[in-house]
Design a protein with these regions (language model features):
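Short, flexible, solvent-exposed loop/turn segments with mixed acidic/basic and small polar residues
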Residues: 1-7, 47-49
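Short, compact, well-ordered microdomains
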Residues: 66-109
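A structural detector for beta-sheet-dominated domains
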Residues: 15-17, 41, 60, 95
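Short, flexible N-terminal segments of the mature chain
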Residues: 20-44
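Short, intrinsically disordered low-complexity segments
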Residues: 36-73
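Short glycine-/aliphatic-rich beta-strand segments at the starts of folded cytosolic domains
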Residues: 6-18, 56
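Short, conserved charged micro-motifs
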Residues: 19-27, 65-72
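Short, low-order "capping/linker" segments at domain edges
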Residues: 52-58, 101-116
């Protein structure tokens, strides 16, 4: 029997509205190409004057695919930006134990309409 491997605990989460099936298709490709293991969980966002379905993506420092915290967070940030485009969303949150980043993106059509 192999000896269990242990790593320091570190987790990063992405929070985003949008279609979970679209997100899972993209995440599946990313995991296949980049040796990742993540969780994908449906969630509901309730906020002032509204409600939206979405999902969370959980990254953990999985011993099979170990990464230092800075690389794990960077990969979560990259995936969040990719998912914003794939799921046609304007924003996402990336959160770990010490920091939350709110990412925003103007859709290409909106960005073009702002140009002179």
């Amino acid at each position: 029997m192999k000896r269990p491997r242990a790593l320091p605990t570190y987790a990063v989460s992405i929070f985003m509205a949008g279609d979970i099936e679209t997100a899972k298709r993209h995440i599946r490709r990313c995991c296949y190409e980049d040796a990742l293991c993540v969780t994908v969980t449906p969630t509901t966002f309730i906020y002032t004057a509204g409600e939206e379905a979405g999902f969370t993506v959980g990254f953990v420092n999985y011993p099979r695919f170990p990464r230092v915290p800075s690389r794990l967070r960077a990969r979560a940030m990259k995936l969040a930006r990719e998912l914003m485009r794939e799921c046609c969303q304007r924003s996402a949150l990336v959160m770990d134990a010490s920091r939350t980043d709110w990412l925003t993106l103007d859709p290409p059509a909106l960005a073009r309409s702002k140009s002179p």
